[in-house]
Amino acid sequence: MTAKRPLRIVGRRRVARRADGREVRRYVPNAGLSVPVVSILDRYGEVLEDEQRAVVRWAVQGGHGANIIFAAGTTGEWNRLDNRRRQQIARVVVDECHRINAAGVAVEAWVGITGDTRAETLENLEYALDLNAEAVVVTPLSIRDSNDPVDFVNREINALFERSKRSIPVFLYDNAEISAPGHAPHLHTRDVKQMSRMDYVRGVKVTAGKAVLGNYTRAASHFNRGGDFAIYAGDPYLIFDLFAPPKGAGGWTRHYWNRYWTRDSLPYGIVAGPSNAMPREWQRALRVCRNGDAALMHRYAQVLEDFRAACEFNRGGRSFRPTLACLKAALAEMGVCRSEALAPGTPAFSDGERREFARRFRDLRRRAAATLEPGWLSEAEAERPQPRRAVKDG
C-alpha cells in the first residue's frame, strides 16, 4: 500500500481513420488526476515563464502527481487575463509537458481555450492544435457572444476542424460561477447529449455539488454512443463521500443515496484545484478512494480538508476563502516559485492573513508527514527533466 510506482493512466490515441476528409483518432480519456495549474505572474501581470515551468514540474511530481496538467483554466485565472497571456501560458505549459514526457514520465497537457468571444475561443483552439496539446477544454456558457452552446460546439468548432483537416479531443466545462451575464448557470443535459454526438467531444468537467454531478452521471449512458464520455468532478472533495464504503446505518444510508444520485456511476476522474499545493497527496487520495480503503481514505481526507480549512478566514463575521492567493502562497512557501502576484480582480489576502496562512500551512505539512504514508508527501523536484538518450551497443 506504500508503493510509489507512478500511476500511468494516460489518454491514448488509437489507429487513425478518415471522416469527412479529416483525420480523426480514437481517444480514450485519462482517468487520473487533473491539476488545473495556477498562472504565475509578475506584479505587472506578465507571465513568468521559468516559474510557470517549475509549477508544472512540481504538479507532476516525477510521475507521482498529476496525470493531466490543465492550463488556462479558472484556477489559472483565464477570465482575468487577456488572450495574449492565455496563449502564452498554454504554450509554456504544453512545452514543459512535452519535455517531461520526453524524459519518460507520462503526463497530458490540456489547454483551456475559452475566450471572451467566439472569435477568441476559436483562435485559441487553433493555437492549441498548433501546440500539439492532448486536449482542450471549453466553457460554452462563459463565451459572451455565444447564445447557443450546441451551435458553437457542433457547428463552429466542427467547421474549424474541417478547414484545418485536424481535430483534437474537446472537453466541456460547466461552472455556474463563471457563466457570462444572461446565460444559464449550468449546461442542460439535453444540450450536452447533443454535443456529445460529435466525435471530438469526449467529456465534461462539472464544478458543482453532488446533485448537479448526479444529473450528468445519470444521463451519461445516453451520451456519445460512439465511444467513451468522461465526467470529471470539479469538486475533488466529493470523492471522499462518493467512494466511501458503507459502514453502519448512516454509512449505508449515504451509500444508497449516492447510488441514487449517480445511478451507480462514479466520476471518471477529478480536476483538483487544491492539488496545486499538494499534488502527490491528491494522487494517492484518488487511488485509495478507488480501492475503497476506508482507513486510508480517512487519513487523506483529514489532511486535505485541513488545507481547505487553512484557506478560510473571518472578515467582518463572515467566512472568506482567498483560494488562489493561498495556492500561490503555498507554492512560494515550498520554494516552487517566488511570485505570488494575482491577476487584477482575484481575491487577495488582507493584512495579517498571509502570515497566518504560512503558519497554518507549515503546521499542516508537519501533520501530513506524521499522518500519511511514506513517499506520499509532495516534494520539489531538483532539476528539469532531461530527455532519455539512446545507449549505443558495445
Name each model feature, range by range:
Residues 4-25, 29, 34-40, 62-64, ...:
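C-terminal alpha-helical cap/extension of soluble enzyme domains
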Residues 2-187, 192, 344-349, 365-392:
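Active-site beta->alpha loop and helix N-cap motifs at the rims of alpha/beta catalytic domains
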